[in-house]
Amino acid sequence: MAQLERSAISGFSSKSRRNSFAYDVKREVYNEETFQQEHKRKASSSGNMNINITTFRHHVQCRCSWHRFLRCVLTIFPFLEWMCMYRLKDWLLGDLLAGISVGLVQVPQGLTLSLLARQLIPPLNIAYAAFCSSVIYVIFGSCHQMSIGSFFLVSALLINVLKVSPFNNGQLVMGSFVKNEFSAPSYLMGYNKSLSVVATTTFLTGIIQLIMGVLGLGFIATYLPESAMSAYLAAVALHIMLSQLTFIFGIMISFHAGPISFFYDIINYCVALPKANSTSILVFLTVVVALRINKCIRISFNQYPIEFPMELFLIIGFTVIANKISMATETSQTLIDMIPYSFLLPVTPDFSLLPKIILQAFSLSLVSSFLLIFLGKKIASLHNYSVNSNQDLIAIGLCNVVSSFFRSCVFTGAIARTIIQDKSGGRQQFASLVGAGVMLLLMVKMGHFFYTLPNAVLAGIILSNVIPYLETISNLPSLWRQDQYDCALWMMTFSSSIFLGLDIGLIISVVSAFFITTVRSHRAKILLLGQIPNTNIYRSINDYREIITIPGVKIFQCCSSITFVNVYYLKHKLLKEVDMVKVPLKEEEIFSLFNSSDTNLQGGKICRCFCNCDDLEPLPRILYTERFENKLDPEASSINLIHCSHFESMNTSQTASEDQVPYTVSSVSQKNQGQQYEEVEEVWLPNNSSRNSSPGLPDVAESQGRRSLIPYSDASLLPSVHTIILDFSMVHYVDSRGLVVLRQICNAFQNANILILIAGCHSSIVRAFERNDFFDAGITKTQLFLSVHDAVLFALSRKVIGSSELSIDESETVIRETYSETDKNDNSRYKMSSSFLGSQKNVSPGFIKIQQPVEEESELDLELESEQEAGLGLDLDLDRELEPEMEPKAETETKTQTEMEPQPETEPEMEPNPKSRPRAHTFPQQRYWPMYHPSMASTQSQTQTRTWSVERRRHPMDSYSPEGNSNEDV
């Protein structure tokens, strides 16, 4: 059969290799803005919808349904679910065997509880409390194989509580059993008070657990990995084995509680070892060997494995033998003879003792609750179902509240009995119900027969069932190889639970798990990606040999959420990859920048006073004083003060063509708007000459001289990288501080002539950007792309011809032609292909260089001729229909357009009209990068359908042009 499966799998894999699949998708390059325009979002379902509810019946129907009501009932009462789907023929026999075995084991455990807890509790009170607790967990519990009862390790924590009011001068706590006369009124009063302390502690423990369950604090267990739960259960198993040494060797010691109590008890056992009972040791070894042999016996019922109930036969057999002959071993008979009552009526706890026991109750509630949750999760993982931690907290809280009226100890999940119930074939809580009934029946009718049962039998049964929890210690080497963090958490939880106790160890485990989870989730892992050749797949450059990097484009993948913890590491990583460092500005540098931007209007005066009735300029949104320097050449790689403002829309009546005005406002556009400059809101940008311009506009030489006074100008920056792409496909959360620093990063690199693009943002991240006011006219949704490949295509499409092919000095001017949306839709000559993929031609938009220097303040009215430029070999399709030959009426159109532009009044002679006009590129109908521009008059923006913008080239840009310098001279 296995060979057939392997052959089928190999045949399927070979068939998959033969039938290779390929896909060819042709679509436009989408950014977030264009994608939302074409594909509308669904309406928000946040619950704030305006629904007209007229009657109470409609009000209830909008919020309640039969399905929700049924789900709520099944959550509160889980037994209804397994009762409705109970398979009687398959599960009944296993549940009966498991219930009888658990019930028989629970009888001697209840009798020896007083011996371990060092408190004389009547046996029938323990039996009734255990029965009520089992029934309550059957109704409200969510674990199918859980057995509820008194757990002696939790009861051992009551030693500190019993020291508050010892009734026999502390002799029982110290391990000396001296039978006293209960007829003395003082002795009986002290005994009743000690029982009241135990009952009040159990009641307060149950109340705390109920509060934890109602508040939903069970989610804490979900943050604890499997390694932490295994380590805690292993530590509990060691504590159980240590406590059973009392029964194995037949000696009594003084138990300790608190830190290092584990080692104190070991020392006490070693001291008392010469008094060990050899008969008890022999009985213990006999039980262990019998249970070990029993593991080799396999029984199945209806294809369900059932282990032979050896514990049932051992308890019955040794009980019969002990009642026939004297075995000279330690039994529970000695302690039971000291108890004055067999049963005490239920009473209410003494609430006056609550302030004295609140710390002990809190410690008991934590240990008992999480022990139950850990054990339930461990068992549920073996049977492929899940448990509800909050529901279990409520269930165990009710169990302890009810058991407190019987003056019993704290109840929780019993590890040994739970394992016995699971391996004996128990499938549902019906087995626990059967076990509780058997236990109560035996304790009421035949309890005295079990008084002579050797305690070593119970110790052998418990140790044989808890030893498997120690097997995780042998798995530590493999756990270290799998995950070092989990291995470290395992060792920390185990060692703290052994050295400091179960309560403190649990707190340390939870805190350590939270810390490790937080560190791992917020630890920034930034990968530098490259492209797999001839694909749209991008992987880490360190993982594949054939991977290629795109010139001028850096792709970074963020593999964690962006928070205040790791956002600065992201910034440091980006600066490191582009070989730049940040350096704080000096005072004279800041003063020089302020002097060049503000005080030049008053002739260099530092202090000036004037009256301004207009609204104050809004404060910049992000302020910090630092500059970036190249590591290799800091003198030639500095940029201006990073001083970013909140860009708002200056005019709501702007046309679509105005949104495509380039970011750097040219001197010609400044001159054209000279009359309206005072009405334009000022925005402080690096090297923004509009900030320095006066209504009179000085001449070219003066403006160039003023520009040279700025100590750190981006005109000297020669970036080898023109675009940085951040892959946010693995980012699921960005906090407020991360958004602020991320915005600073975008503006800082923008001032360095490096564009930041973000790819693969989840919709929740985009909404977080919108809620935190991340976008404005400077940083828009056009910088957000749906995939990394979209961002790469856009980054390559915006490359311009740089200094490697064309020699552009500072006096050269670049002219870009833009069209309005209506002009693009009406004229077919400006259409472009609907896809960037699938074309043999590789055309990239470029700027036309004007060979002859032109005066800066001259006004140009030029048409640019379309030219094509070879790309970089990527799958770019920038198909354009070239503009047809110009007709004679083009000259009249040019004259008309020239008349529409605002003419300056002071210097009309500075406007030469060139004779030849080369035509410009037909740019795609996109708005990927809307830049800031001063507002135009509303009347002019409505009538002007085609605009021209002249940009001042501050520095050459790297580009790729295999045809070399093919531009025509103007």
From Swiss-Prot:
It is found in: Membrane. One of its GO terms (molecular function) is sulfate:chloride antiporter activity. Glycans are attached at residue 192. It is a multi-pass membrane protein. Residues 117-119, 168-202, 254-270, 329-355, 414-429, 474-497 are extracellular. It comes from the Eukaryota. Residues 877-898 have a biased composition (Basic and acidic residues). GO terms for biological process: cell differentiation; chloride transmembrane transport; chloride transport; meiotic cell cycle; oxalate transport; spermatogenesis; sulfate transmembrane transport. One of its GO terms (cellular component) is sperm annulus. Changing residue 914 to S: Not a cause of male infertility. Activity is inhibited by 4,4'-Di-isothiocyanatostilbene-2,2'-disulfonic acid (DIDS - an inhibitor of several anion channels and transporters) and gluconate. Residues 938-948 have a biased composition (Low complexity). PROSITE patterns: STAS (PS50801). N-glycosylated. Residues 543-795 form the STAS domain. Residues 858-868 have a biased composition (Acidic residues). Residues 858-970 are annotated as: Disordered. Induction: Repressed by tunicamycin, an inhibitor of N-glycosylation. Belongs to the SLC26A/SulP transporter (TC 2.A.53) family. Interacts with RACGAP1. Interacts with CFTR; stimulates anion transport activity of CFTR. PANTHER family: SULFATE TRANSPORTER. This is Testis anion transporter 1. The gene is SLC26A8.
